[in-house]
Structure formats: C-alpha cells, structure tokens
UniProtKB/Swiss-Prot annotation:
It comes from Anas platyrhynchos (Mallard). GO terms for molecular function: metal ion binding. The lineage of its organism: Eukaryota, Metazoa, Chordata, Craniata, Vertebrata. This is Ovotransferrin. Monomer. Residues 7-333, 345-670 form the Transferrin-like domain.
Length: 686
C-alpha cells in the first residue's frame, strides 16, 4: 500500500485538541491520517503552518488576512458553507441601515450618532470604520497617532460600540446602567442589538449585516433604507449592489505547496461521512445552539454545514475581496501605507510594446496616468480586482470575465464614423464577428471540421468565443482541439493542435503561441496573416480585411492583396462578399470596453474624457501623443478607435455584452473555464 500522508491540524484550546483527537478516532480509514498540534493562539498556528510544523487551521476573515501576509503567505484552500434562507452561502454583506425619511448620505456621516455590533467585529466595526478611514472621511494617521477608537469618537457625535472601553463617547448611546452598558454582550450588542439601537432612536445609522432587518422587523422593512458607498440610498433588499463589503466565510488555510490536495481529500471525506445529516455520533460541525462559550465553534464554526474547495488561483486578497481587504488594511495601517491615489489612474499594460506606449502616455499626462505592466489580460483583471491597478481596455470576451470578477464597463471604443462620438451613447457600439476564407477555396460553414483555423486569441470575441460557441452548440463537445486539424489560437496549451501553425516572434521559441503581440499571428491582423500564409479560415471582425488590403498594410505578407481574394462564410452554409458583413456574419458583438472597479468608474470616466480632449483623434495635444494610434498592433486601445463612448452609469456587463453574446460566452465557459473565471465564479456565487 502507498505510504499514508499525515495531515497535522492546528488547535488553539484543550477543548479543540480534544475534539481533534476524537475526530482522529472516528475517522474513516483513509490514505490520510490525522495528527493534532496544539498551540496557544491562532497566530502561533499560522507561524507553525508556515514553518511546516503543522498543516491547516480554519480562520475568520481578519485572521485569513494576517495568514496571507509575508512572511507566512498562507492561502485559503477550503471555505465553510453556512445555511441561509434561500440556499447555502459562503459569505454575508456588511450594510449601513438608516431610517427612511432622514435625508443624509454617506458623505454626511460626520457628527451623526452610530450603532455598532461590537468593537473589532467585521460588519459592525472593521468594515465601516476601515472604509471611512480608507475614504479619508475619518482622519487617522495610523497606529502612531493613537488608537483608531479615538479617531472614531471625534467623527461621530456619540455611539454605541459594545466592548469599547477607552472612549466614553463610544458607549454613550448604549442601554443599561453605567457598569454594564459598555460590555461586549450588553443589550445593544450583536446584529439585533445594533438594529434595536437604531430603532430606539439612539443612533442615526446601524452597521449590521444584510439579513438583520429581515430577521428582526420583516414587517417594517419599508421604513428602513441602506446607505451606499456611491453616495445614494437603496431599499433594504438591494444589499447586493449597496453594501460596504462582502464578508467571506471562515476558511481553512495552508501553505501553498503540494500538500493542499491531501488536506482537501481528507476534509472532503470527513465532511461527507461525519458532517451534517450523518448518523455518526461525532459531529465535524456544531451542532449549533451550544450554551457554553468554551465549547462553541471548535475547529469549525458551529453553523457550518459543509466545506467547499477554493479554486487554485485564489489567494487571501482575492478571497476576502477588495472592500473587506482594504478596510482591514486601513485599520492596521502604520505610517508606511500610502493613501488612496485619488487623482491618478493606474493603467494596466500588457507586454513590452504596451509598456513603452503607456510610459509615453504617463509622461505627457503629467503623471495623471501611471502604468502597471503585466504579462496578460487575466493578470490585469486580477490586479484591478485587488485594487492594485485601475483600468484596462478589454475585448468583450474578457469583459465577461472581468464582469464576473466584479468589474464594470466604463466607456466603449467606437470605430464607426465620428457622428457616434458626440452622442452620449446609452447603447454601446457594435461590430460584426465574421469567418473569412480565401475565395479560391471550397469551404463553407458546414464543412469546416478538419480544416486549418486562425484565431485572434483564446477567449477573445470574434476570434474564439463566437466561432467556438457556435461550434460547441452544434457538436455539444468541449474538445475544440479535435475539431480543426491544426491552427493558431494564441493562448492555447503549447503542445495543442491549435498552436501548431503559430510562429512566435521569430526571436524566441518560448513566445510561440503566446497571447500578446510577441506572436506574429496574434490579434485581427495576425489571424488574417495566418490565413494568407497557412490557414483555411480566419475568425476576425468585419473590417479586418479592408484594413489590410490594397496597400493599407505595407508589410511584405500583405503586398498585392485585394478584397476580392477573400469571402465570408454565412452560418446558413452560403458565402458572401467581404462587404456584405451586415447580412453574412457569425454574430453582432459589442466593441471593446474599458473596465474598472465600480467605485472608481466615475473617476476613470472623467479622467479619460480629459485625456481624450488632449490626445484623442482631434485632441489639442495630439502632436505630442495619440492615445489610440500605435506603431505596431492595437496597443492599449484598438488603433481604429475614433473616440470613447460614455456608457450610462450603472450599466452591467451583461447589458453591455447583450443577450446573444452573453449566452454564447456563458455556454462556452461551461467547457473549461479559465482558472481566473473559476475564482470569480466562486466569489460571485457567494
């Protein structure tokens, strides 16, 4: 038999140690054995796991934050799942509840009275206070300048913060006699207590979670509203769009090494055989409702009903989410952390060609635009989700992924005539995805199988999502590698058939088939070049042929080409001239869009408007720099962009993509979702 692996669980009390040893005795005979390691505190456990003296422990959000910091760098590998009315979930939302009829907004909170669940609690303290510090509403210079409680006492006129002992003002609004009213478990503590404090008129705002009003006063729900970060108010049920942060469930953390699979197979097995609804006399979780605090929440929270595996790419920062992560960061800040870069925009550039263009833009914009350089679009989406970069212009396929990751479209590129430009577009601009073949071939949409294909890149709209979505609907198979005999789809696995025709940059073998301008056949022009030199069909957009024939493209491969050398494939099996794309196309799709985090959207919209006045097609400074044009392929923006079109505030990525396209990408992504999409789907499902 193969040697058994041991998983060393870290415990922080004798009650936990006892439960852990009992679990060891009840374990189903598995290839994994359990040993229990007791430490004094969760921080000692984090250190022990980091030093390879233990393997795993389940922690709450604030502790997951610490475990993820250097030097420990632990990552969440499984999330606890809790039951809620309407299904199971792995998170809740922190909200600010106010009475309807009071007319103040988030910016008017200074001098108001406030109700909190308790000092140091997520929804009641860490998130609201961290957020107000992050927004620079509460002025606090960090630990050096005194404890954050003093800064909060200066901000609100009076509060009830159960457990606060340093500042009298922070429990002035609490209920009870002088001795007990400030206690952690006083009458106004917890979610229902903080809500009662608002109800009794002791506070103007209560910081609670999204279910609190429903659980305490369902029939009075209409008398309350939520304060949103964007400066508006919304009904109590709109907590998904009007919350201060999503609070992640407790998570099991571990070192980022090969042991993760063993820990998960051990956890999955135990949760299955010893979890809720099993006949075992040992309970892995709970049961809930224990009276003795010493016996509560041992190893896992009592309210957990199961564990859910966390996708590979997830780290603590993605797991906790931007709002929660920044709130905790703001509460722990010392002098070293930088304040928010309010009037700058951190643009995300991909590869060295975009870097040099972005650096020039940064110089001419007097530093209003700064650049973050990464290897591909996916890395940029992660960076923006984490708040370490602000914006990037993406193809619709990536707008989908970015949307699932919580980013929103801010402006769209427009390529048609300039009449579109002056209009404030409610509707995004569109283009057509087409399939182009050589006129001399006998190929139709119905006999494409086994031919040689050329794609702009995996995951992009015209080059991949549309044609492969249609093929997927037709064949029902996810084996795209088998459909064409060979091809070039930059971003495919290096040994796949769909990298066979790719060329790289000619300088570096490792660059063959990469999804960036380092691959000759990347993008629209690249895919057309691949058709001319090697392929049978190219999946591009309606204008690509016109942009590269009759001398428009001076490169050797395009010499002598005319429109008449090519035809379009229609989905009904017919063929058409390349100018007939309005009647013969694979789909009508939205243009590229700049995406950003929702709370940055307006800032970026304004900033881009200003930049376009200077460096756009008719910019006053376009001799110095042109933001849409570039020497090589489409850098930062598509080169044909005539202008950026403002999208209406609050537009969702689904609306931007349109039903037809959204459905096609969603269906395609059931096949093999990228690691990033798995992470964001996990977070979106919460």
């Amino acid at each position: 038999a193969p040697p058994k692996t041991t998983v060393r669980w870290c415990t922080i009390s004798s009650a936990e140690e006892k439960k852990c040893n009992s679990l060891k005795d009840h374990m189903q005979q598995e290839r994994v054995t359990l040993s229990c390691v007791q430490k004094a505190t969760y921080l000692d456990c984090i250190k022990a796991i980091s030093n390879n003296e233990a393997d795993a422990i389940s922690l709450d959000g604030g502790q997951v934050f610490e475990a993820g910091l250097a030097p420990y760098k632990l990552k969440p590998i499984a999330a606890e799942v809790y039951e809620r009315s309407g299904g199971s979930t792995t998170s809740y939302y922190a909200v600010a509840v106010v009475k309807k009829g009071t007319d103040f907004m988030i910016k008017d909170l200074r001098g108001k009275t406030s109700c909190h669940t308790g000092l140091g609690r997520s929804a009641g303290w860490n998130i609201p206070i961290g957020t107000l510090i992050h927004r620079e509403d509460i002025e606090w210079e960090g630990i050096e300048s005194g404890i954050s409680e003093q800064a909060v006492a200066k901000f609100f006129s009076a509060s009830c913060v159960p457990g606060a002992t340093i500042e009298q003002k922070l429990c002035r609004q609490c209920k009870g006699d002088a001795k007990t009213k400030c206690l952690r478990n006083g009458p106004y503590s917890g979610y229902s207590g903080a809500f009662q404090c608002l109800k009794d008129g002791k506070g103007d705002v209560a910081f609670v979670k999204h279910t609190t009003v429903q659980e305490n006063a369902p029939e009075e729900k209409d008398e309350y509203e939520l304060l949103c970060l964007d400066g508006s108010r919304q009904p109590v049920d709109s907590y998904k769009t009007c919350n201060w942060a999503r609070v992640a469930a407790h998570a099991v953390v571990a070192r980022d090494d090969s042991k993760i699979d063993d820990i998960w197979s051990f956890l999955g097995m135990q949760a299955y055989s010893l979890g809720v609804d099993t006949t075992s006399d040992f309970h892995l979780f709970g049961p809930p409702g224990k009276k003795d605090p010493v016996l509560k929440d041992l190893l896992f929270k009592d309210s957990a009903i199961m564990l859910k595996r966390v996708p590979e790419l997830m780290d603590s920062q993605l797991y906790l989410g931007f709002e929660y992560y920044s709130a905790i960061q703001s509460l722990r800040k010392d002098q070293l952390t930088v304040g928010p870069r309010e009037n700058k925009i951190q643009w995300c550039a991909v590869g060295k060609d975009e870097k040099s263009k972005c650096d020039r833009w940064s110089v001419v914009s007097n530093g209003e635009v700064e650049c973050t350089i990464l290897d591909d679009n996916k890395d940029c989406i992660v960076k923006i989700t984490k708040g370490e970069a602000d914006a990037i212009s993406l193809d619709g396929g990536f707008v989908y992924t970015a949307g699932v990751c919580g980013l929103v479209p801010v402006v769209g590129e427009s390529y048609e005539d300039e009449t579109q430009c002056s209009k404030d577009e409610e509707q995004p601009a569109y283009y057509f995805a087409v399939a182009v073949v050589k006129k001399s071939s006998a190929i139709t949409w119905n006999n494409l199988q086994g031919k040689k294909s050329c794609h702009t890149a995996v995951g992009r709209t015209a080059g991949w999502n549309i044609p492969m979505g249609l093929i997927h609907n037709k064949t029902g198979s996810c084996d795209f590698d088998d459909y064409f005999s060979e091809g070039c789809a930059p971003g495919s696995p290096p040994n796949s058939r769909l990298c066979k025709l790719c060329q790289g940059s000619g300088e570096n073998l490792l660059e063959k088939c990469v999804a960036s301008s380092h691959e000759k056949y990347y993008g629209y022009t690249g895919a057309l070049r691949c058709l001319v030199e090697q392929g049978d069909v190219a999946f591009i957009k309606h204008s690509t042929v016109g942009e590269n024939v009759s001398g428009s493209n001076k490169d050797d491969w395009a010499k002598g080409l005319t429109r008449d050398d090519f035809e379009l494939l229609c989905t009904n099996g017919k063929r058409a001239k390349t100018m007939d794309y309005k009647t013969c196309h694979l789909a009508k799709v939205p243009t590229h869009a700049v995406v950003a985090r929702p709370e940055k959207a307006n800032k970026i919209r304004e900033l881009l408007e200003g930049q376009e006045k200077l460096f756009g097609l008719h910019g006053t400074e376009k001799e110095r720099f042109m933001m849409f044009q570039s020497q090589t392929k489409d850098l930062l923006f598509k080169a044909l962009t005539k202008c950026l079109v403002k999208l209406r505030q609050g537009i969702t990525y689904k609306e931007f993509l349109g039903d037809e396209y959204y459905a096609s990408v969603a269906s395609l992504n059931t096949c093999n979702p990228s690691d990033l999409l798995q992470v964001c789907t996990f977070l979106e499902d919460k």
